């Protein structure tokens, strides 16, 4: 599944594929969210391509299958951290990291609550989760985001846009880019 300009998502059961010069993300989504076919995942991956550099430290909030954090590493990020409240998601993300050649030296995963488990600051924070979770967590994200970092949020159905934008704004974020696909939204945000 080609995504953006640089990535090709290859479900592990697909034997025949041509990378076409793209970074290949080998993925077994299991029961965790993030197979690469959903609009929100594609929107996030396309946004990540713009911001990942060799110095990027990335945080994946609600990491699911690990698709966003593993893709960030494939795009050249220095390190990635994933956190999810679902232990199965964390296990799946770890397996997908290993499947793509990333061990604990570059890819760290935590099971539990964002604020209980994570410390430090990141250049890119991505959260492809439901609107209610974005609204709830956005007040916490600022302390994990570098001042010049980017907060990529998706999982937002268009009918919830105003509510999410208001929450982001009240938490000190401004939307620098709005992307839409099939009624789903992704915002690229910076600190105000």
Model-derived regions: residue spans:
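Non-catalytic substrate-recognition/targeting regions of SAM-dependent transferases
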Residues: 1-34
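Structural motif
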Residues: 6-8, 23-25, 57, 79, ...
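Structural signal for conserved beta-strand scaffold positions within catalytic alpha/beta enzyme cores
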Residues: 9-11, 26, 60, 111, ...
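Generic structural signal for well-ordered alpha-helical scaffold segments
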Residues: 14, 45-49, 142
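Short, glycine- and charge-enriched coil/turn segments that flank and shape catalytic ligand pockets
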Residues: 14-24, 52-55, 116-119
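Conserved SAM/SAH cofactor-binding pocket of Class I
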Residues: 31-114, 118
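S-adenosylmethionine
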Residues: 79, 85-191
């Amino acid at each position: 599944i080609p995504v953006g300009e640089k990535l090709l998502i290859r479900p592990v059961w697909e034997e025949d594929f041509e990378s076409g010069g793209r970074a290949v993300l080998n993925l077994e989504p299991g029961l965790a969210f993030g197979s690469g076919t959903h609009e929100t995942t594609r929107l996030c991956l396309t946004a990540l391509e713009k911001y990942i550099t060799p110095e990027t430290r990335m945080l994946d909030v609600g990491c699911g299958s690990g698709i966003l954090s593993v893709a960030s590493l494939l795009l050249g990020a220095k390190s990635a951290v994933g956190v999810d409240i679902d232990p199965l998601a964390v296990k799946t993300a770890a397996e997908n990291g290993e499947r793509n050649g990333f061990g604990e030296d570059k890819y760290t995963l935590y099971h539990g609550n964002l604020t209980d488990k994570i410390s430090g600051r990141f250049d890119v924070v991505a959260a492809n989760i439901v609107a209610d979770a974005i609204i709830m967590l956005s007040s916490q994200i600022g302390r994990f985001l570098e001042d010049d970092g980017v907060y990529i949020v998706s999982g937002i159905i268009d009918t919830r846009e105003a509510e999410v934008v208001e929450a982001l704004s009240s938490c000190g974020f401004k939307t620098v880019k709005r992307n839409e696909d099939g009624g789903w939204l992704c915002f690229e945000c910076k600190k105000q």
